[in-house]
Amino acid sequence: MPRHSLRQIALFWSVNVARLVLAATFIFSGFVKAADPMGMFHKLSAYFAHWGYTFPLDSLILRGMVVCLAAVEFVLGLQFLLGMRMRLTAWCSTLFMTAMTLLTIYIYRYEPVPDCGCFGDAYVLSNGATLAKNVVLLLLCGLCLFAGRYTKRLISERNQWLTSIYTWVYVLGLCLYTLHYIPILEFTDYRNGTHWRDAWEGRFSAEAPESLSTLCFTDAQTGDDVTEQVLDSGYCFLLTMPEISTADAGNNDRINDIYDECVDNGYRFYLAVGEPWKKEDLQRWVDYTGAAYPVVSADAVQLKAMVRSNPGLLLLRDGIQIRKWSGNDLPILNDALAQQTYRNSLRGLIGLSDDNGDWRELPEKSRFFWKRPLGRLVLWYIIPLLVIMALDNLWVGSKYYRRYTQRRRLRRQQNAQATPAPEMDQQEEAPAEENQ
């Protein structure tokens, strides 16, 4: 086999393996950012705080940066996966990874944050591991840039725009949904079913992670430690406000209704504000909302991880996390019709049985992938994408079939014109014999 053939084969396999590695990395990185944008929001906020810039939790600028970052990474990953617009994709990814590599060099040298957050809270890498990863990815981007002609495209050039638009719509829709509500996928240690009290008491397990051992709730008025009361047996609603100065008070009526129901039924209800907090901010909230519930303070970083919302609502039973809600999705309890509906009643919210006071256990995780939140998110994207690719292959196949039939018809016509008819030859020979 000639040397150039071996070289081409080696380049083909090297470039396509690099393309798939880049695709997997960019898709995973963009997906986890889109599935939990507020997690990346807090990472970027920590970066800017190190450089002397502070952003409130309701900053649209920082949220826009997170959405753009997630969307760009996800779209680049898809373009690598399908081999679309490889030269443009390779150039964009090379510039992107160059900037990220320079940033991680700075992070590795000065350590402004404990981890870079490239994969959010889904998979935490050390700063050294992140730097090594980015260097490898930058080299792979360079390989795709200088030998991109050896990549194999999985969708026709004519229909690339449709796949790109669909991907942009999907990732932007996922970002906006999870920004408005809480993330569909929970990457933090504060997922439903977590045993807060066991972790606080030092009994660590898969359901009681060690990161919760530092939980501490302090009475805002007296300064006493009230963690024992918050994690005590029975039901406890925890209204989390990592940053009370920017907390959205649009749903204060729903919050007050839930508090009134808790008082009537003997359930605990606390407002947990992030430290440090100012008395004037708390007083402004009380004056505006008419809040009468007790206030405790806690670490703002932990409150941000509990619920990706400001405010957010948590429900604990015997120190076990049961449910959580975004401030934009709080239940309505003051409507007469809603009170008649079990799901919108307080009994339905806390998980009590409809006919008696027995506790309904949390539903077990389904063994079917498509019934899990991750499975539904993946299928919502994969199934339409496969339909688009199947229709594209049908279009390409029909085009080649038409060309094949046209060439076959033309070849038959050419053969018919080139081959003389036998009857005509005999008629030409007959007059020649008569003349002789």
Residue ranges and their predicted role:
Residues 18-19, 25, 37-147:
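Hydrophobic alpha-helical segments
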Residues 135-167:
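Cytosolic-side transmembrane helix boundary signature
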Residues 156-185:
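Internal/C-terminal transmembrane anchor helices
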Residues 177-229:
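N-terminal "domain-start" segment that seeds a small globular fold
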Residues 227-247:
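Short active-site neighborhood of thiol/selenol oxidoreductases, capturing the structured segment around
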Residues 287-310:
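Short, internal strand/loop/helix patches
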Residues 311-325:
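A short, hydrophobic beta-strand/beta-hairpin element that forms part of a small beta-sheet core
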Residues 378-427:
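Juxtamembrane interface at the cytosolic side of transmembrane helices
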